[in-house]
Amino acid sequence: YQLSWGILPMAKSFLTSLDVRAIAQPYMVAIRNQLQQSVNLFLAQGDYRICIERVAADKPLRHDIKIGTVYPIFKGAAGKIFGAYLADFKDADMSAGESAKIRRDGYVITRGNRVPDAASIAVPIFSFGNKLEAVMTISGPIGDYTEERVKEYLSAIRVLGQTISKEMGATL
C-alpha cells in the first residue's frame, strides 16, 4: 500500500483540529519558570482578542490578566501582531511600514502601551498553512524589561513561538 493525495484533506482536518491551548500550556509553564514573567495566549474574535490561557509569574509584582478577558484587538503587543498578520483587520494607528516590520521581525515589544507600568513581548503562533492561529506574550513590570533582559526574553519567546507553531503544523 502507498499513500495518495487523498490523504491531504484528512491531514488538514487533523492539523486544524489541534488545540493551540493544550499544545502551548506546558511550554508556557516552562518559559514562565525560566524567565519569571507572566505568559499569555490570545485568540482573535472579530474586533477583539481573548486571553485563552495564562500562566502568571510567581512573584508579588506582576502584570495580571485573567483567562477570558476580552480586549480591543488592536491594543497592546498582542494586538499589534494581530494587526500585522490578519488581512481583514486594519488598525488605523498602524502604518503599512510598521506592519511590514512586525511581519519581517516576527515579534513586537511594547512598554507602557496598554498599561502604563507594564511591558510585553508578543510573537505569532501559526498553524497548518502558516495561518496565524494565536499570539503569545510575556509580560511584566516595565522595570524588568532592561536592554539585557529583553534580549534574553526575546530569544526565549521567539524559540517558543516557533516550536509551538511547528507542533501546530506550520512550516516556518
Spell out what each predicted region is.
Residues 125-128:
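Sensor-regulatory modules in signal-transduction proteins
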